[in-house]
Amino acid sequence: GHISHWHHELWANGYSSRPGRSLIPTLLGASQCAQGQPMPLAINPPLAAGGGSDRNAIPGYSFDNTHVVNHRLTVMPIRTSAMRALGAFANVFAIESFMDELAHASGQDPLQFRKLHMQDPRSLAVLNAVVDRSTWWHLPKAEGVGHGVAWARYKNTSAWCAVLARVQAGETLRVLQLDVAVDVGRVVDLDGVINQTEGGALQGMSWALKEAVQFDRTRITTQSWADYPILRFSEVPELKIHVLDQPEQPSLGAGESVQGPVAAALSNALFDALEVRVRNLPLSQDHILQALNAPN
């Protein structure tokens, strides 16, 4: 089977309230003065300019019918701002996790199911490259070990990225290996591309496994590193970056293509290991236990 209709809705604020983009003061402190200016609405640029919350909400697949709706929220008790990759992180996580769910629901291999819906040759090339160059993807898996795959083209106009994840899953998730393939067009600085991709992959892994800002109806309640854990050096997996040089193609940015695919690949690997789907980030012990104990 194949997908005939795809419907995606999201609800989000704008992402940028930085100083210098408004006719009135936008420093947070200015809104707290006795006669200060109210904070302006955060900017959310149109998708044609790269988008904000809706970045990568349009899937990179060829479906017969695609319907994407972005609901712009204008009221929030706390200020929102930019995050690396903006909405691409959440949207790619959602799209690639659900593609995995659909593959399993239809009894198809997740990798082949993706290829069934792909027509862009460079998308196929980056996905094939990460699989072909991986030394572990086709190896037998021990109990509790899972493999996951995800990919995206950043902004649907920039760099291509595909990720394979190998995890050991139980009440907690341990990442054993990550393989990443990227196509940034003509490579000007190979070390720079590798460094950006490695750093982005580890940051995406930290977001996916650990990071969460807590808040109530009026304020952020997360106060320190004690209640905002991040990835530690001891948790860094074996990480391999495979760069596809395209010397005849324009160069593309390398810094924000990998975060979303990493999160989705980890989620899909967790499902492969435990056969339970964790749909809420981070993929923490609490969320894994909730999924394991949820009624079928």
Predicted regions and their residues:
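Cofactor-binding beta-sheet edge motifs in enzyme active sites
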Residues: 2-296
